[in-house]
Design a protein with these regions (language model features):
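Extended, solvent-exposed segments with strong compositional bias
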Residues: 7-20, 80-125, 137-144
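Extended extracellular/luminal ectodomain segments enriched in beta-structured repeat modules
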Residues: 35-43
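Short coil-to-beta strand junction motifs in C2/discoidin
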Residues: 55-68, 149-151
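Solvent-exposed strand-loop boundary residues in beta-sheet-rich modules
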Residues: 74-78
Length: 180
């Protein structure tokens, strides 16, 4: 499901996954939907992706304002919905969690989720798979603005992905006729 796992949160124990930009649905995070009756619903927490630096915090240059946009699409490239997360980072307390398995102090990675936007999107009946695909990221710093939208760039993080659906009834198999 997660082609670009970031790792597990040290405090929340959530699994975090990078969302990359792309042009094709197969480039995103693929979510398979079992056979279902009526619409299904995908929900997840969308976070901005921050490169944490203690040095920038100490020098009062850590400010960032992130705006990440992702789309949830069907496999034929039909956009079901867009989702946006926007937040500001100033200090370590603005992080959602730290990701374990890194070379930083305490064994954490420099990349960390910041900001949380709960997302819930209805998926029409008949869809068997959807994708979460990054569209763009805008990063505002004290000294300028960066825009990221080239394919293959990580622009956001998702966690807590859940799928709600009403299972389709099992297919009935005809009972064999008895021989007399």
């Amino acid at each position: 499901m997660c082609p670009n796992p970031l790792g597990q949160g040290v405090q929340t124990h959530r699994t975090f996954c990078d969302v990359l930009t792309g042009r094709e649905p197969a480039d995103g995070i693929l979510v398979d939907i079992p056979p279902h009756v009526g619409p299904a619903r995908i929900s997840f927490d969308l976070h901005n992706r921050h490169m944490y630096s203690e040095e920038l915090i100490k020098s009062n240059r850590a400010y960032r304002r992130y705006t990440a946009t992702v789309g949830v699409l069907t496999m034929d490239n039909t956009l079901l919905s867009r989702a946006v997360v926007q937040n500001e980072f100033r200090a370590a307390g603005d992080l959602v969690d730290r990701i374990g398995g890194g070379a930083g102090p305490g064994g954490v990675k420099a990349v960390a989720p910041t900001g949380t936007e709960p997302i819930s999107i209805e998926i029409p009946e008949g869809e068997e798979r959807v994708t979460i695909l990054g569209e763009k990221l805008i990063v505002e710093r004290l000294d300028g603005v960066d825009n990221f939208q080239l394919p293959g760039q990580p622009v956001a993080i998702v966690s807590n992905v859940m799928l709600e659906y009403r299972p389709a009834p099992p297919k009935r198999t005809p009972t064999p006729a008895r021989r007399r």
